A protein has these predicted regions:
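GT-A fold catalytic core of metal-dependent nucleotide-sugar glycosyltransferases
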Residues: 65-114, 138
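Alpha-helix N-cap/loop-to-helix initiation residues
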Residues: 15-16, 88
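Zn2+-dependent metallopeptidase catalytic core
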Residues: 23, 27
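Short, surface-exposed amphipathic charged segments that create phosphate/polyanion-binding patches used
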Residues: 49-57, 119-124, 189-192
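A glycosyltransferase accessory/donor-loop signature
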Residues: 2-14, 20, 30-32, 38-45, ...
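Conserved catalytic core of nucleotide-sugar-dependent glycosyltransferases
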Residues: 98-160
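Short, solvent-exposed loop/edge-beta patches enriched in aromatic
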Residues: 2-3, 29-33, 72-80
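Active-site-proximal specificity loops/subdomain of glycosyltransferases
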Residues: 35-72
C-alpha cells in the first residue's frame, strides 16, 4: 500500500495567500497522494505542544514550530517540512524519492550570507551558519528524537536552526539545489529549472514586493489565478 507523502508547512498568518497557492501547486504537480498539514501556531499552543515566547529575532510564526514535526509523526517514518513562502513547479515525489537512511535530515545546503539587515515587512534579517537549510527538510523522524517538546520550546534559535540536536553534520545529507531556490538571492539563471522556488526575502503576496523575482513574481500570480479560478 502506498501511503500519502506527509508534508508539513510552516504558516504565518500574514502569508495565507502564499500558503494556499503552495498547497495547490504541490498537489497539482505531484504524482503521488499527499497528506499536507499546515502548522498553525495557535492550534499547537492549544494542544500544549508549543509554549515558547516569541523571540524578537524570529521573522515568522513558524520559525520554531517546524521542529515539532518529528513529535507530530510519533518519531516514526519520514516527513517533509517546508516554509509557506514557496511555489512547487516539480513533482514533490521526486524529492521524496531521494530519502537516504544514512541521514537524520536532508536539505539544500546553501551558502547564504545575507547582504541586507531587513527583509519583508521590516523583519530583522539574521545571519548565521546553515542559513535557510531548515526551510526545506526531509526529516528521518526516528533519528530526530532529541527534538522533544521540552527541547523545541527551550532551545535557542541557533541551536535549533544550526542542527545542534544532531550528533554532528555527518547526519545531514544534501538534496539537489533546485529543491530550495532562493528567489532574488541566488543566480536567477538557476531558477529556470528549479522545481521549488522560495521567496525567503518576501514574496509578491506582500504589497511592497509585488514584483519580487521579476518573471517569477508573474509566475506566482499565474499560479494563484489558476488555484482560485472558478469553474465555467
Amino acid at each position: 500500500m502506498t501511503h500519502p507523502i506527509p508534508i508539513f508547512i510552516g504558516v504565518d498568518p500574514r502569508e495565507r495567500a502564499a500558503t494556499n497557492v503552495l498547497i495547490d501547486s504541490l498537489y497539482q504537480h505531484s504524482s503521488k497522494p499527499l497528506a499536507i498539514t499546515p502548522l498553525i501556531t495557535p492550534q499547537l499552543e492549544a494542544q500544549g505542544l508549543y509554549w515558547r515566547a516569541r523571540d524578537p529575532k524570529q521573522s515568522t510564526a513558524f520559525s520554531f514550530t517546524r521542529f515539532l514535526v518529528p513529535h507530530l509523526m510519533g518519531y516514526e517514518g519520514w516527513a517533509i517540512f517546508m516554509d509557506c513562502d514557496m511555489l512547487a513547479r516539480g513533482d514533490i515525489a521526486e524529492l521524496w524519492n531521494v530519502r537516504n537512511e544514512s541521514f537524520a535530515v536532508q536539505c539544500v545546503q546553501h551558502e547564504h550570507i545575507p547582504g541586507e539587515t531587513v527583509k519583508f515587512l521590516g523583519e530583522v534579517q539574521s545571519a548565521y551558519p546553515k542559513k535557510n537549510w531548515s526551510s526545506l527538510m526531509l526529516l528521518n523522524c526516528s533519528r530526530c528524537t532529541k527534538l522533544s517538546l521540552d527541547y523545541v520550546n527551550t532551545a535557542t534559535g541557533l541551536e535549533l536552526h544550526r542542527f545542534h540536536w544532531l550528533e554532528g553534520d555527518h547526519q545531514i545529507g544534501a538534496v539537489p539545489d533546485g529543491w530550495n531556490h532562493l528567489v532574488a538571492v541566488q543566480n536567477p539563471a538557476k531558477a529556470e529549472a528549479a522545481p521549488l522556488l522560495h521567496w525567503t526575502l518576501g514574496g509578491p503576496w506582500f504589497k511592497a514586493q509585488r514584483t519580487m523575482g521579476g518573471e517569477l513574481a508573474a509566475e506566482w500570480f499565474t499560479a494563484r489565478d489558476e488555484a482560485f479560478r472558478l469553474y465555467e
